[in-house]
Curated annotation (Swiss-Prot):
Function noted in UniProt: Involved in the modulation of the specificity of the ClpAP-mediated ATP-dependent protein degradation.
Family: Belongs to the ClpS family.
Record-linked InterPro entries: ClpS, ClpS_core, Ribosomal_bL12_C/ClpS-like
Species assigned in the record: Edwardsiella ictaluri (strain 93-146)
Name of the protein described by the UniProt record: ATP-dependent Clp protease adapter protein ClpS
Subunit description: Binds to the N-terminal domain of the chaperone ClpA.
Cross-referenced Pfam families: ClpS
GO biological process per UniProt: protein catabolic process; proteolysis
Length: 106
């Protein structure tokens, strides 16, 4: 006769269902868009302040924004990306620059 614990062992079933139910979070690209008025130095400052890029990488991204119209600054989960976009846009407005930061699904 089978042991009662063998009949009631639901652990493998629950584990399988959990593995199938948990998906990795969606990722979003944070994008800086070019405009004709924001100084290049300010864009570099934003990249260093909000993304912790060194001066060389920040300058490369600033030039990408300038010449290609936009650049992906990083890829994050939705909450982190939305927060960065909001903080950057507020920082730009507080400093009277029209710099626009947006996000797109990666």
């Amino acid at each position: 006769m089978a042991n009662l614990n063998d009949w009631l062992n639901l652990e493998p079933l629950a584990e399988d269902q959990t593995r199938r139910a948990v998906k990795p979070p969606s990722l979003y690209s944070v994008i800086l868009n070019n405009d004709d008025y924001t100084p290049m130095e300010f864009v570099i400052e934003v990249l260093q302040t909000f993304f912790a890029y060194d001066i060389e990488r920040a300058t490369q991204l600033m030039l990408t924004v300038h010449y290609k119209g936009k650049a992906v600054c990083g890829v994050f989960t939705a909450e982190v990306a939305e927060t960065k976009v909001a903080l950057i846009n507020r920082y730009a407005r507080d400093n009277e620059h029209p710099l626009l930061c947006t996000l797109e699904k990666a």
